[in-house]
Regions:
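Amphipathic alpha-helical hairpins
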Residues: 1-165
Length: 165
């Protein structure tokens, strides 16, 4: 796609975000299967359903813009997925939950950056309804990041306590 205009560039990035959400929907299931702790599995399962809605919100954004869904690639998520899978394979089983949370945290940071940029550009285009849908996605991703951080801190504290015991 030629992205020589701001609207075309926005559509490209919106399409990339759509592919990001579709890929993360798959990845979250894999992370859930890799995780050991029930609270991590549950959080990943819940966010997976939110991720499904994120993709549908983006589809609705394209409809509001009167455009077909742009099928732009999202190489960042592809690379993060490869890295996460390789790291999980090489990690001692007792540390897998921590690695799963690291992967979740990294992807949430990326998603937050994507949505913040898209929202700014949607407002610049005067596409208020589009910005509102993207804001819903952003809010859920910020919450997912907080859940991952909190759980990661709990695991770290438990690990330190076990080491000091």
């Amino acid at each position: 796609m030629n992205t020589s205009t701001l609207p075309k560039s926005f559509s490209f990035k919106l399409g990339s975000a759509h592919n990001m959400e579709k890929k993360l929907f798959e990845v979250l299931e894999e992370l859930e299967q890799a995780a050991h702790r029930d609270e991590i599995k549950q959080a990943l399962r819940e966010h997976r359903e939110e991720t499904r809605q994120h993709a549908m919100n983006i589809e609705q954004c394209f409809a509001l813009l009167g455009e077909d869904i742009d099928d732009s690639p999202c190489p960042v998520v592809e690379a993060m997925t490869k890295e996460g899978k390789a790291t999980i394979k090489k990690t001692d089983d007792s540390l897998v939950d921590a690695i799963v949370l690291v992967a979740a945290t990294e992807s949430e940071h990326y998603e937050i950056a994507v949505y913040e940029t898209l929202i700014t550009n949607a407002h610049a285009r005067g596409a208020t309804q589009v910005a509102e849908l993207l804001q819903q996605n952003l809010d859920q991703d910020k919450h997912a990041l907080e859940v991952a951080r909190s759980t990661m801190n709990t695991i770290a504290e438990q690990g330190i306590a076990a080491t000091n015991a």
